[in-house]
Regions:
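Ser/Thr/Pro-rich, low-complexity mucin-like regions
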Residues: 9-12, 154, 168-172
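A generic structural signal for short coil/turn motifs at secondary-structure boundaries
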Residues: 155, 252-255
């Protein structure tokens, strides 16, 4: 297979080389999660780690920085970090944090760890719109593969309720999925799905989703087939985006999950043709 090396200049103008494999006719989108860089969050916030390549992979750390002011008495910590003991090299460790002790905890009682293809752009008025899922994808996706470990936390919190409820008789689960969606609407305008509509949008075409989000103590491999939504087919004349989305709490977007639920993912890969 052909192995191409791209030089990418990041925002701090350090040139890094990334290796992208293109194997035969089958196009493989692969993230080894070995390379991470420290993101400068500015003088008011603690820095955090972000996976490479930037612009392709993002995390929920960008939102959690508001809970980690450098002079703040209460710091919640960051929900996504590099796991050095990955399945192969580094991996991504996603943790659901109880953020109720922070002044902003009323807005976000829990902060789940999420890793996704796309970009994070903080929207304080509509937090779910901060996660802009998906990157351009020009193949028909067939399989979504990877390895993971998961351990649900013990104190399940429902932050969607006022007042917040905790200690609920619910066992948390992780969420791992890949979604193919149309990149343009009928008038040719760009479509980008966010935390608001990634699970409901009419632009979704196919999805590969892990059915079993329960605890897995040992590294567990998954190989998921893309299933098409009703009345949807792949059309090679259309433009598409592909969103890989992993979360330490499957309902974290609704501020529901267990404190300390931990998902570790590695070697994520989408095979298309």
């Amino acid at each position: 297979y052909k192995r191409q090396v791209y030089s990418v200049v990041s925002e701090d103008v350090t040139s890094r080389k990334y290796t992208v494999s293109i194997e035969g006719v089958q196009n493989i989108m692969r993230y080894s999660l070995d390379e991470w860089s420290e993101f400068d969050a500015g003088s008011s916030y603690d820095n955090y780690w972000t996976p490479e390549p930037a612009g392709f992979l993002a995390t929920s750390n960008g939102g959690a920085k508001m809970l980690n002011g450098s002079s703040s008495a209460v710091k919640v910590g960051y929900p996504v970090m590099k796991e050095t003991e990955g399945f192969n090299g580094g991996a991504a460790k996603l943790v659901t944090l109880d953020s109720r002790g922070h002044a902003l905890g009323s807005l976000a009682p829990i902060t789940s760890g999420s890793l996704f293809t796309g970009v994070f752009s903080l929207n304080m008025l509509a937090p779910l719109k901060s996660t802009k899922f998906g990157i351009a994808y020009d193949k028909e996706p067939k399989l979504f593969k990877g390895v993971y470990k998961y351990k649900a936390g013990t104190n399940y919190i429902d932050g969607s309720k006022k007042p917040v409820e905790e200690g609920l008789d619910v066992v948390d689960e992780c969420s791992i999925a890949a979604v193919l969606y149309e990149a343009k609407d009928a008038s040719g305008k760009d479509v980008t799905l966010t935390g608001v509509d990634i699970n409901t949008s009419e632009y979704r075409v196919a999805e590969a989703r892990l059915k079993d989000g329960t605890d897995k103590e040992a590294w567990t491999a998954f190989e998921l087939t893309f299933e098409y939504f009703p009345d949807k087919v792949y059309d090679s004349t259309k433009e598409y985006k592909l969103a890989i989305v992993c979360s330490s709490s499957k309902e974290g977007d609704k501020f529901k999950g267990a404190a300390n639920s931990t998902l570790i993912v590695d070697e994520l890969e989408v095979v298309g043709e």
